[in-house]
Amino acid sequence: MNLPIYQTDPATATRYLFFTGKGGVGKTSLSCATALKLAEAGKRVLLVSTDPASNLDEVLETHLTNAPTAIVGVPGLDAMNIDPVEAAAAYRERLIGPMRGLLPEAALRNMEEQLSGSCTVEIAAFDEFTALIGDPEAAKNYDHVVFDTAPTGHTLRLMSLAKAWDQFLDTSTSGSSCLGPLAGLDKQRAIYEATVHTLADATATTLVLVSRPQSAALNEAQRTSGELRDLGVGNQRLVINGVFETNCPDDVTALALQRRGIAAIEAASAFINSLPTSIVPLRPVNILGVQGLRILLDEGSSSIAKPLPNGWSPPAMESLEDLVADIERQGNGVIMTMGKGGVGKTTVAAAIAVMLAKRGHSVHLSTTDPAAHVAQTLAGQVVGLTLSKIDPAKETAAYQEEVMAAQGAAMDAAGRSLLEEDLRSPCTEEIAVFRAFAREVGHGTNRFVVLDTAPTGHTLLLLDASEAYQRELERQARSTQPEEVLKLLERLRDPAFTRILLITLPEATPVHEAADLQEDLRRARIEPFAWVVNQSLLHSGSSDPLLQGREESERRYLSEVVATHSTRTAWLPWQAEEPTGPDALARLAVSSLKPAIPTKKP
């Protein structure tokens, strides 16, 4: 399939550009490169991240805040991070501040508790997001506003809030919800309505669906396209990032990588042909800094590669089998894979589950990822292994029914209406999903439970909820809590029961985001069991100059993980065949038994 190279035309670019896609496909790099191209064409551009796990700072090599910051060396380009936690704190203070000194301290504390849930973080970030679109004054000094949006699940929720909260405000009668006084939202009614209109205006807004030449990423882009189109965002284009072509006909690794990409693109041809589609070639280096961003969209740069240095010795790492052998000694417990979107959490979780099951253990593999690709990675059955997905819609409906049955029976019509209204809040979904998460962890007392968790930002919100959860349930007057809910945080903090594996790629952003996640876990008194460096090209034997450049660039990050971040590290090589289904996962397990990097001695 002959697809054009992605280019940004300043003459036809809409004022608002959104980049979305499966975690790890390159949304940040492409949004930054696009903003750079527009600015260098003389446009005034504001680049914005609304991602709780934003790595915009790292790509731009500039410390950003929630106010526009000029990017050195690029006149006309400003960038900012909408930090959800900071936005939530500001939102709480905006609502509570005027009441200080007027209400008793106990009442103020109660309000703060009601505004401490994760959906307050969501709506506060959305509040700033809408201001940039719906308020003509907010971005009046810019020709273009480019949004580096979050991994897909979060993006869909962020987009859908525009309609969901507009409808909620239309039907609300109580003036309060788990978000606190609705007056804080109602003041922004005109801005919200303008945002909804702008998102649906093809002359104002373009949605750039970013994908990779991989089946899961392209399937996710297609799903996202349909859902956002249903939300009214119809002006869409697809960019397939990291497309690889080799000039080395005898290179097994290069040919396998090229063949895999071609097969994925051909399988998605109907979707690709349904909207404007372009590609970005794979580059030999990680995209960091302004110069790296220029290389990303430079058609002549694909052959640039640095020579491999002599004398570099790889750090000692373990095999995945070493970790599983240690894990299985306990006989039961919970294994959780965490990390940036797109690093292979699902694949590693599925491989561990298959390895444990093949060793005769009872294993349950479950996903809390809104994108839920685990079924695609494990498209078959293994004796002793069961599989489930935590479905937010089903869990929310079940939770709503349970609360209505427990509380609503003794209420009058007005009371039931108020309760129903409160349960329509987005916070209810977080609680319902959290309950399901706790239930899965609780099952680890008599078997192994492997949790394929969501990308970093969502995972942190999920873990954060563990301490805020009890307060929120008390607010909804639940009389008793399941034992697994009450014991969850204790179990997560027990290293003999819960093993958390931080999954990363040997690249700058995945490594540094995994390190940040490790610090967040440690602040919650949760210690990771090990790191897993996935998809390494080290010792691939490739003679392709571009892949040699990729291999050279990953060496510093392999060394950094072992020397700086991890006390225990496993290494997984890049696989010529994409590991989907139990047979391929078994082969991945076999390959990890013979790591090219020497195994660390106990």
Features from the language model and the residues they span:
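Phosphate/Mg2+-binding loops and adjacent switch elements
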Residues: R100-R223, A410-T509, E513-D516
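Hydrophobic "anchor" residues on beta-strands that sit immediately upstream
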Residues: L47, H144, V208, R237, ...
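Switch/connector loops and helix/strand junctions flanking conserved nucleotide-binding motifs
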Residues: S54-V59, A87-Y91, G153-R157, L218-N219, ...
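Conserved beta-strand position immediately N-terminal to the Walker
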Residues: L17, I335
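Conserved catalytic network of the ASCE P-loop NTPase/AAA+ motor domain
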Residues: P10-A11, K37-A41, I71-V74, D135-K140, ...
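P-loop NTPase motor core
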Residues: L47, S54-T120, A372-R424
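C-terminal lobe/tail of nucleotide-utilizing enzymes
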Residues: M1-A11, H63, T195-N332, R493-T498, ...
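Walker A/P-loop NTP-binding active-site region of P-loop NTPases
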Residues: F18-I82, T149, M159-K163, G342-E395, ...
